[in-house]
């Protein structure tokens, strides 16, 4: 059986990356919430 997690940096960044977050209003809300919470990492990064 094939495992479900097949890592790909490109796919990861296109789905959860900074540019995608900034491109929508809801994405910017996510970033601002994470800044307000004091997250060290705002986005997933490899």
UniProtKB/Swiss-Prot annotation:
Give a GO cellular-component term.
Answer: ribonucleoprotein complex
| Listed Pfam families | Ribosomal_L34 (PF00468)
- UniProt entry tagged with the keyword Signal: no
Q: Name one GO molecular function term.
A: structural constituent of ribosome
The record's annotation in Gene3D superfamilies points to: 1.10.287.3980
Checking InterPro entries in the record gives: Ribosomal_bL34, Ribosomal_bL34_CS
Swiss-Prot/TrEMBL GO biological process terms: translation
Asked if the keyword Translocase belongs to this entry, the reply reads: no
Alphabetic keyword roster: Ribonucleoprotein, Ribosomal protein
Tell me the protein family, please.
Belongs to the bacterial ribosomal protein bL34 family.
* Protein name (Swiss-Prot/TrEMBL): Large ribosomal subunit protein bL34
Species assigned in the record: Blochmanniella floridana
